């Protein structure tokens, strides 16, 4: 009993949800045109990242189902919907107002909720997520969930910099935004991949040089996963 309690305490300590009841505030408060404008600015500020992903998406074969984690107001399924002309797209976002915008402007499937906690019964040929892991309360659980719900491919980006020597994830809570601003540890996520059964030849972690005009982070992290069985 004592050992189980200690394990639970360590688990809570190593995530960031405990005590932060305003988690997700920055995404929940915006609505309508203001919300669309905000997501469009975010998308435009990561052009190189998105270009890399689009090229990656176009070279994947036999994709029938795709899941986007953190779809926002739907830049991909609405403005870039031609990418999914022959694919069943599903988008997930924690913001109820963002998902309302998606459903209003697209016939694709959309789900609202905390991806880490959502019960997702089906698996997808490709799961991708842009600049979401930088803000979640449990980075390992977030990435592990993506690995779990993909049949074959996953593409994950972290935009706050490339930290090859960082031994553990670094989490910084911003109370005004109701969000974390995380530094993503490549060393720690490699350990997590091994723990959940991914072989070294099934994932690739690289730095992507970007033109961050308003940020000091000139490099971003791109994780590409391809399951072999």
Model-derived features: positions:
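Conserved class I S-adenosyl-L-methionine
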Residues: 1-58, 63-72, 155-183
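A conserved beta-strand element that flanks and buttresses the S-adenosyl-L-methionine
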Residues: 128
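Short catalytic micro-motifs in class I SAM-dependent methyltransferases
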Residues: 131-135
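A short glycine-rich, Lys/Arg-flanked "PGG" loop and its adjoining helix->strand segment in the class I
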Residues: 141-154
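Class I SAM-dependent methyltransferase SAM/SAH-binding core
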Residues: 73-115
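Short alpha-helix
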Residues: 179-197
């Amino acid at each position: 009993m004592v050992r189980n309690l200690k394990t639970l305490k360590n688990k809570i300590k190593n995530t960031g949800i405990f005590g932060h009841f305003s988690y997700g505030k920055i995404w929940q408060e915006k609505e309508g045109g203001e919300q669309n404008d905000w997501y469009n600015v975010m998308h435009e500020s990561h052009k190189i990242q998105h270009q890399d992903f689009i090229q990656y998406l176009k070279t994947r074969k036999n994709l029938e189902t795709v899941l986007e984690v953190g779809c926002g107001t739907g830049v991909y399924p609405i403005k870039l919907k031609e990418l999914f002309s022959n694919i069943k797209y599903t988008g997930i976002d924690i913001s109820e107002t963002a998902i309302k915008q998606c459903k209003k402007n697209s016939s694709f499937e959309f789900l609202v909720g905390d991806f880490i906690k959502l019960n997702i019964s089906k698996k997808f040929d490709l799961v991708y997520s842009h600049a979401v892991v930088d803000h979640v309360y449990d980075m390992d659980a977030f990435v592990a969930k993506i690995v779990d719900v993909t049949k074959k491919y996953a593409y994950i980006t972290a935009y706050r910099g490339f930290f090859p020597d960082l031994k553990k994830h670094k989490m910084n809570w911003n109370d005004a935004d109701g969000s974390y601003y995380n530094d993503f540890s490549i060393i720690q996520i490699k350990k997590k991949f091994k723990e959940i059964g991914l072989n070294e030849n099934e994932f690739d972690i690289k730095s992507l040089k970007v033109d961050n005009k308003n940020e000091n982070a000139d490099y971003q992290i791109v994780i590409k996963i391809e399951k072999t069985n």
